[in-house]
């Protein structure tokens, strides 16, 4: 008996996503692929697998495999000894340990077994069309002549296609602005840039390296109580010792596409 997966088995939908049409939520399209059947005829085999059978890819940039359901059927009597190890692999990754998405083991005496994996990551549709996933099947301690088929595997997946996978980027934050005005967008942009870790690191590094009067600010032992160590010439301003202040130039924000949610995002 085949396992018919449900989207809810792999993905927790919010009330909004359950009620509203897909076009009005970020879950643009969630598809359940038709089955791909693998006939196992060797004690060990590595073969490509299509996890996206009949999943629409042409109109989208990315596809995410939310879950994969495997159903195995032993084609031998249930008193036979032995078992099988099934591993799902992302063949794009060269490191064997890192390329393994998940592994399942089943004994031949169980006759039928089912398991599911949750890869839960996106790939580009260009990569998806090249079938980046493989299944490694290793039958152990099952004494059967070569050329016979002791096991059949059926694979079904739940996938989501979308045109945008950057959920915490500036674009998503701008779209989330309720009041579409220039000031609001500028605030979002400023907050976003200020929160970026690389920007913080550069800003902190620059502050440590600033110098006043040829002396490093951080190494000046008088910087905390300058009034106690002010000399007669301390009020004389020297241009080379002054901190220069530059007024920020305002940059116009064009709203031709900003602030309008794309229908296929």
From Swiss-Prot:
A Pfam short name: MP
Annotated spans, Disordered: 216-248
Claim: Transport is one of the keywords in the record: yes
Coiled coil: none
GO biological process: transport of virus in host, cell to cell
Gene Ontology CC: one annotated term: host cell cytoplasm
Function comment: Transports viral genome to neighboring plant cells directly through plasmosdesmata, without any budding. The movement protein allows efficient cell to cell propagation, by bypassing the host cell wall barrier. Forms a ribonucleoprotein complex with viral RNA. Binds microtubules and modulates microtubule stability. Can bind double-stranded DNA.
Assigned protein family: Belongs to the tobamovirus movement protein family.
Full protein name: Movement protein
Protein's organism: Ribgrass mosaic virus (RMV)
């Amino acid at each position: 008996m085949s396992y018919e997966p449900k989207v809810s088995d792999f993905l927790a939908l919010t009330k909004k996503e359950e009620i509203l049409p897909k076009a009005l939520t970020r879950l643009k399209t969630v598809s359940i692929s038709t089955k791909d059947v693998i006939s196992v005829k060797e004690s060990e085999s590595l073969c490509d697998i299509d996890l996206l059978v009949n999943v629409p890819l042409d109109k989208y940039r990315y596809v995410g495999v939310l879950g994969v359901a495997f159903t195995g059927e032993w084609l031998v009597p249930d008193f036979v000894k032995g078992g099988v190890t099934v591993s799902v692999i992302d063949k794009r990754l060269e490191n064997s340990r890192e390329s393994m998405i998940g592994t399942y083991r089943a004994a031949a005496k169980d006759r039928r077994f089912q398991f599911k994996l949750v890869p839960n990551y996106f790939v580009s549709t260009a990569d998806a069309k090249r079938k980046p996933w493989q299944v490694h099947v290793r039958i152990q301690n099952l004494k059967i002549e070569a050329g016979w088929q002791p096991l059949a595997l059926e694979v079904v997946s739940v996938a989501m296609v979308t045109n945008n996978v950057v959920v915490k980027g500036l674009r998503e934050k701008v779209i989330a602005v309720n009041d579409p005005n220039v000031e609001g967008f500028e605030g979002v942009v400023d907050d976003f840039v200020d929160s970026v870790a690389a920007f913080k690191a550069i800003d902190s590094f620059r502050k440590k390296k600033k110098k006043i009067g040829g002396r490093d600010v951080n190494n000046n032992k008088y910087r905390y109580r300058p009034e106690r160590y002010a000399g007669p010439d301390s009020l004389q301003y020297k241009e080379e010792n002054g901190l220069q202040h530059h007024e920020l130039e305002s940059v116009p924000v064009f709203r031709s596409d900003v602030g309008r949610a794309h229908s296929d995002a």
